[in-house]
Amino acid sequence: PWVQDGSFVAGDLLEMRPQMQWLTWIFQVMPIFFIVGGYANAVSLESAHRKGTRYAGWLAGRLHRLVTPLLGLLMGWGVLAMALYFSGVAGDTTRLVTRAALIPTWFLAIYIAIVMLAPLTYRAWQRWGFASLLGLAALAALVDVAFFVAELRWMGWTQYFWVWLTVHQLGYAWRDGRLGSPARLLGWSLLGFATLWALIFNGPYPFAMVGSPDEGLSNTLPPKITLIALGVCQFGLLLSIEAPMRRLLSSVRLWAATVLINSMIMTLYLWHITVMIVVVVIAYFAANSVLTLEPGTSEWWASRPLWILLLYVILLPLTFALPGLERRPRPADAPTPAAPRQIGGAIMICLGIAYLALFGFGSAPLPYLDILAFVTVVAGSWLSGLLHGFR
């Protein structure tokens, strides 16, 4: 956003400056998140198998690691939304702010569901290998055909599963080391890039890989098979340099820094937009001229280093203060709920998060639906044994 005549103006840089859309091919990194997640889930499942840990115990540990940092963010914004409501702030304003702050949570709404299915998808990978990946990709392609050709738009929302499950399978391939030489990996990358290029320039898909200036059409809302192609492109390119990166990380200091960042990565991800909102509010009340610059102008670009510096000044202390929630291990003596109970609670968490990521607090298609979504997340957390009140 920027300030014009003393008021905030919400705008889309991709719509105002369409020539910048190519940057989204670089900065759309969600496929990498799911690929790394697939690798991590494979490692975790292998460890659980060696230790004789059953599904319920494994799932309890994974949910604790994922949901605990999320609850802090939701609690904070839930309290703030209530304070804004009783202060007389317009519901649309509260919705705009909270929706922006909670956008990162959509990832967990999908990833938690994928984690619950990980034992099945990993078994499918072990049995069928790349055929399991191709089967999911084919299903995703069929859904896109239904979306565009048959105009069954509602089916597009199922792509949150098919697209991201396909990309997640790449993480299993990485873990198994069945990818070949760096040259072969670069071939994967070129194949992904060529497929993405063909889909966009010969198909109905928009160019932008983050958001879209095209009304009602996006590669991400809901996901499209273009994200699979982008994921393959990124996957091949990054893994082609895995060996030199491993040598680089043999340095004790670099490895220690990597471990430190990994221990707080969920905090960084979940809170970065909240910090951006804080910086915007501070700059607005400080009459900061940075906010009066129209996005995309040369002056606006010149101010980006200062803007990023302000973000880091607030984000870094917060990152070091909050990871206690992220790093805190699940108590060894904590009872483990039965698997069906955990699954039911996790589904409730996913549904509540999905709603809040889409609509935020303060305004709802039906009255009090935002409150119901928040309560659903809390109740699901209790049901899954993630709250101290669990017995």
Annotate the PLM regions.
Residues 1-391:
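Alpha-helical transmembrane segments and their immediate juxtamembrane cytosolic regions
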